[in-house]
Amino acid sequence: MKRFSFFLAPVSNVVPHKTVGIEQIYNVIRGDYYRAATEELRSLIQGEGVTQRDVQRFKARNFDYATFSGEFSRRREDALLAHSGLLCLDFDHISRWQGGGHLQGVYGLRYALAHDASVDTALLFRSPGGDGLKW
């Protein structure tokens, strides 16, 4: 099983909480664990006078995170203990993405990535803000 480091919020925490696998992350994302923070973030984004910096600060304080590329002793490039064989691509602000079909935005890109036969997809999910994807 491919394993990688999982860190508890805030993002300033550079020591991993534990080592996890794709199935554990999938279960956390699909469950209710981040629902309240996600809803609060999406409300914040819709608010007047909210800056990108406000949004980034909220995410940094309220969401745990993972280093899908491998296991680390600390969150630093030179602290890699074992590579997972995974690579995570982060697509931000894709509400205007248009593919070849009728689907557009996050849902269109998600469909295109999920059906790309040239890449093995381990996990594909919407980012907490709602207008991005993690692949």
Feature annotation, model-predicted:
Residues 1-131:
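Signature for HUH/AEP ssDNA processing cores
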